[in-house]
Amino acid sequence: MEKIPSFQLDHIRLKRGIYVSRKDYIGGEVVTTFDIRMKEPNREPVLGAPELHTIEHLAATYLRNHPLYKDRIVFWGPMGCLTGNYFLMRGDYVSKDILPLMQETFRFIRDFEGEVPGTEPRDCGNCLLHNLPMAKYEAEKYLREVLDVATEENLNYPD
């Protein structure tokens, strides 16, 4: 079997950032898949499943309610490797286009207070697997160290 494109990416050189993972054409429209990479693969500890799950709930809720983008949001979900998230949007985008949106999203997570949306047993398949304090910590770290100081190497995959 052929290696799929995401397994051909040089994870040894990959930094934290926002990357265009792929673009698909569905019904005449482009769907852009972003790699929202919060941890350097194989070089730093991965995100814990509880905080990543909380980030998923908060980011998905925020984005699907965003006044400008809610109709363009397709999906937000965690990577199996626990180093970040995949984010799919209708439209032909580059990473720089969504940097302000990601800054807003991670500020929302960092500043969130109260009950995390969708964490009741009827709403979630694993409602006990959440950690809001750590989600807020990871959101702040990603904002401060990556999103608020992003350079080209945080926005384009290494060659």
From Swiss-Prot:
Pfam families: LuxS. GO terms for biological process: quorum sensing. Fe cation binds at residues 53, 57, 124. It catalyses: S-(5-deoxy-D-ribos-5-yl)-L-homocysteine = (S)-4,5-dihydroxypentane-2,3-dione + L-homocysteine. Keywords: Autoinducer synthesis, Iron, Lyase, Metal-binding, Quorum sensing. Its EC number is 4.4.1.21. The keyword Iron applies. It is an enzyme of class 4 (lyase). InterPro entries: LuxS_sf, Metalloenz_LuxS/M16, S-ribosylhomocysteinase. It comes from the Bacteria. Its cofactor is Fe cation. The keyword ATP-binding does not apply. Signal peptide: none annotated. Binds 1 Fe cation per subunit. Gene3D superfamilies: S-ribosylhomocysteinase (LuxS). GO terms for molecular function: iron ion binding; S-ribosylhomocysteine lyase activity. NCBIfam families: PRK02260.1-4. Involved in the synthesis of autoinducer 2 (AI-2) which is secreted by bacteria and is used to communicate both the cell density and the metabolic potential of the environment. The regulation of gene expression in response to changes in cell density is called quorum sensing. Catalyzes the transformation of S-ribosylhomocysteine (RHC) to homocysteine (HC) and 4,5-dihydroxy-2,3-pentadione (DPD). PANTHER family: S-RIBOSYLHOMOCYSTEINE LYASE. Homodimer. Belongs to the LuxS family. This is S-ribosylhomocysteine lyase. It comes from Porphyromonas gingivalis (strain ATCC BAA-308 / W83). The lineage of its organism: Bacteria, Pseudomonadati, Bacteroidota, Bacteroidia, Bacteroidales.
